[in-house]
């Protein structure tokens, strides 16, 4: 039976499965997530996510602020890494690992510490106790069967993004649809067979939404315009494929968006190339990618009045340098006189403000780490003993206190500097321990007095102090006189013989100006060539030279060999010669660097008067040799070189072999800041190499910052020069686009009108023929209607005649009827009169 122990190094496939499972199941179902990984438990999966795979975890380099905060919190909350981690912004394992690394760096200064004895380093055969916080192992090309099976099962389970409940609902929905279709088919077949199996409606307590419309509002009776309502019903499109049901995948959507971006960029580049280039430059700008930190400038430490005094002193020294009469004299005379244009003597405070704010004493992070390491290694107070020596620290808050950075004031620095033997000596004060010098803190900025013209003449109350002052003055005078150089030149006065008078004086011919200029130019060139031959081979061949800043390092490296040797054993002639060569080399380097400085930026900005003053005051005097002596020395050096080649067996070596050997030696040289000298890297230790690489990295970083400032300055300058052209280009480009758009619209209209013309020409003949046929038909119709109209007029006239006859007959009949009525009335009237007469007679 095979027993599987869960754990071990995480692999790339396991990380990918874990990330996909967290995306599906969330960060609470670790048991279900661990079921996808055969070799990992739920606890290990959770630890892997929160220690490495979580996107919120910072995996960048630790900053100085984070280190300070970590050490401060470790001092306040020891071993409480889960409390410290969210404050620092890292995981607990990262905080613990960084804390131990800082303690190791602090312990490297201990002589008894050995990095090979670190118990945290894994030895061959040991198992990593915390593999969840380490990078994943790459997948092998040929995975075993267990890994393939695990991968396929995880792919199958993770592909089911809808879940079991959604599948069950879909299956029930399909069964219900099949049941309904079967019932409908059954009713249709029974109806076709003549069997009326009516479906009885079940009575519902509430509203039957299948038969009734809830909250229906019927339209009022009447006639209304339904033109807007007579619209064709939109055909509802239901999803029929799996892609339509599930929707578009995220990968397809992203690919489509990328294509749209590419097409949009192409259109933008084609239509508005300057704007597209400007947008690309903005995206590639390092200021956008890298968030610049806030510039913290210290408050000014020098007042305007003090700056004016410094400027006046520099202006006075420039006026003295411009005076040619003061700079005349030989090298010996200049060596005896003091130079007031140089920096004040050693021990005095410089007048210039430093270029940058000096750093604090030591590294604060290393100091805190050393404190914690000493506290960790200290014994319990129950055993007694001395307390460990700790650096100054504070427990004032949760986070370390920020230190205010200030630029030192050179005008106020002397008054703040404690007294010591290295400061400006003042007579009559407390003597130092060795009794050789007296020192105090100056009250203000000391004035330079190299010739002791303004020497203090204060008398001390104590006779002992006055005696010591006089002895000090005598000792300084005696040491100054012993340091005078030996006389180098012997002066001899030779009387020149009187010139012989020629019997026939030659006529003086006035020289032409062009000939004079050519002669002076030739003489100057000859003089320059003669001076060039007397210079060193480095200057003659224009070879690279060490800068002035590295002369101190070269001096220490050249003179360090003499300091290591014992003074008891007398030096050999070869050692004496080697020492003389090194001293001559150092003197020649300083002379060339002072008289022929490198053309760097600082030298270019300075004027010619500053260079003249420097060459006259700072150039060291060296021996002046004739050209013959120099040629003889070159000859001797060549002979010595040939002798060395023969004696060392290098006569058959080619120039390429010497170049290769020289390059090997040069590449092996490295500057070690711990020793302040150049030495061979092959024989140096790891700590020295690390310090050398750190120094080189710091120099490269400073160079990058300078280049970045140059680039920003050039960019601003470029914008200043091209802003108007860019605006003009944008205006012209807008006009061009408008013109092109109008031309495109005009071309489209022309094509449309041409097409209309062709269509009109084709349809004109057809319409003309149709119109002619319609005219003919209209004429025939009008002729028929005219004929019918004439017939109708005849019928109307005939009818009118008939009506006139009928009307005459009617009038005649009416007259006859009236006559008959009149006769009847007359008869009636006659009969009434007779009746009245009879009645009267009867009454009588």
UniProtKB/Swiss-Prot annotation:
Biased composition (Basic and acidic residues): 113-126, 446-475
Cross-referenced Pfam families: Myb_Cef, Myb_DNA-bind_6
Null mutant phenotype: Accelerated cell death. Enhanced susceptibility to virulent and avirulent pathogens.
Bias type Polar residues, positions: 406-416, 433-442
CDD domains: SANT, SANT_CDC5_II
PROSITE patterns linked to this entry: HTH_MYB
Location of region: Disordered: 113-147, 379-514
Start and end residues of each HTH myb-type domain: 2-57, 58-107
Keywords per UniProt: Activator, Cell cycle, Coiled coil, DNA damage, DNA repair, DNA-binding, Immunity, Innate immunity, mRNA processing, mRNA splicing, Nucleus, Phosphoprotein, Plant defense, Repeat, Spliceosome, Transcription, Transcription regulation
Gene Ontology CC annotations of this record: extracellular region; Prp19 complex; spliceosomal complex
DNA-binding region residue numbers: 30-53, 81-103
PTM annotation (Phosphothreonine): residues: 343
Subcellular location: Nucleus
Location, primary (coarse class): nucleus
GO biological process: defense response to bacterium; defense response to fungus; DNA repair; innate immune response; mRNA splicing, via spliceosome; regulation of DNA-templated transcription
Expression tissues: Expressed extensively in shoot and root meristems.
GO molecular function, one term: DNA binding
Coiled-coil blocks: 145-189, 685-723
Subunit structure: Component of the multiprotein assembly MOS4-associated complex (MAC) at least composed of MOS4, CDC5, PRL1 and PRP19. Interacts with PRL1, MOS4 and PRP19A. Associated with the spliceosome.
Protein name, per record: Cell division cycle 5-like protein
Organism, scientific name: Arabidopsis thaliana
